């Protein structure tokens, strides 16, 4: 088994010349390699809809974790229910932070997402994902190279130093248009916020719509240097 510790033995390669640009092959390999020790960390963005559909074909009982920060858009929570109905056999886990919003405010002040967004992300996303990955050998992410400068070198299989794990990214070669084409082709549910200028959807407090021609991550932590929550730093 390929693990974080045995990374030097990595000799896995995949063809990108199929209909899914390698995504199904990558997922088939991952679930065979790790069996029950892999989880998909899903934010329920539009890429997530594609991956959930593909994963359901490969492993209908796969584990899916959603990092419920308690400050997501209502549309996101409604979408999760639609996904549960569309893919009832998937094991979708809504992972909560240890601190409630009230407890966080007492410790760090109100609106931590404004005063210290990095700490807010650590409490409400990074630490919960660490807990979710504690007993896993690998995790799946919907990163695409096209999304931003920080993601353009992502590979199918990555040694993830942040979580000391293997990070599997099946959609790295997909374009934004290809993602949507797949969603429409298979009549997949998606977050209606995508239709009003939100290409990337995170917490309600830190996500704004993006103007035409903007980077897909421009609406995240707008006005700050920050463009990543910290889950994908190497």
Curated annotation (Swiss-Prot):
The EC number(s) this enzyme carries: 1.8.4.10
Per UniProt, the cofactor note for this protein states:
Binds 1 [4Fe-4S] cluster per subunit.
Pathway as given in its UniProt record: Sulfur metabolism; hydrogen sulfide biosynthesis; sulfite from sulfate
Provide the primary localization: cytoplasm
- Which major enzyme category is it? oxidoreductase
Mention one GO biological process in which this protein takes part, according to its record. hydrogen sulfide biosynthetic process
Under InterPro entries, the record lists:
APS_reductase, PAPS/APS_Rdtase, PAPS_reduct_dom, Rossmann-like_a/b/a_fold
The Gene Ontology terms for molecular function here are: 4 iron, 4 sulfur cluster binding; adenylyl-sulfate reductase (thioredoxin) activity; metal ion binding; phosphoadenylyl-sulfate reductase (thioredoxin) activity
Gene Ontology CC annotations of this record: cytoplasm
Gene3D superfamilies the record matches: HUPs
User: What reaction(s) does this enzyme catalyze?
Assistant: [thioredoxin]-disulfide + sulfite + AMP + 2 H(+) = adenosine 5'-phosphosulfate + [thioredoxin]-dithiol
Question: Known Pfam families for this protein?
Answer: PAPS_reduct
Q: Where are the transmembrane segments?
A: none
Q: Which NCBIfam families match?
A: APS_reductase (TIGR02055), cysH (TIGR00434), PRK02090.1 (NF002537)
Function of this protein? Answer: Catalyzes the formation of sulfite from adenosine 5'-phosphosulfate (APS) using thioredoxin as an electron donor.
Any idea what this protein is called?
Adenosine 5'-phosphosulfate reductase
């Amino acid at each position: 088994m390929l693990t974080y510790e045995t990374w030097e033995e990595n000799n896995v390669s995949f063809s990108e010349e199929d209909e899914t640009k390698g995504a199904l092959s990558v997922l088939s390999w991952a679930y065979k390699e790790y069996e029950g020790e892999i989880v998909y960390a899903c934010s329920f963005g539009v890429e997530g809809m594609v991956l959930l559909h593909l994963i359901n074909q490969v492993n209908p009982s796969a584990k899916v974790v959603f990092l419920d920060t308690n400050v997501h858009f209502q549309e996101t929570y409604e979408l999760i229910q639609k996904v549960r109905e569309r893919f009832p056999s998937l094991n979708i886990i809504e992972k909560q932070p240890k601190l409630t919003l009230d407890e966080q405010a007492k410790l760090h002040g109100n609106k931590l997402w404004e005063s210290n967004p990095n700490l807010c992300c650590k409490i409400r996303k990074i630490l919960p994902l660490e807990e979710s990955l504690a007993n896993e050998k690998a995790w799946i992410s919907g990163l695409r190279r096209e999304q931003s400068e920080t993601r353009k070198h992502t590979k199918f299989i990555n040694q993830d130093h942040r979580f000391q794990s293997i990070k599997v990214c099946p959609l790295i070669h997909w374009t934004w248009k290809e993602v949507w084409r797949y969603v429409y082709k298979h009549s997949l549910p998606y977050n209606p916020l995508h239709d009003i200028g939100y290409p990337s959807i995170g917490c309600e407090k830190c996500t704004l719509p993006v103007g035409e021609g903007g980077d897909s991550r421009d609406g995240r932590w707008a006005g700050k240097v920050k463009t990543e929550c910290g889950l994908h730093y190497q």
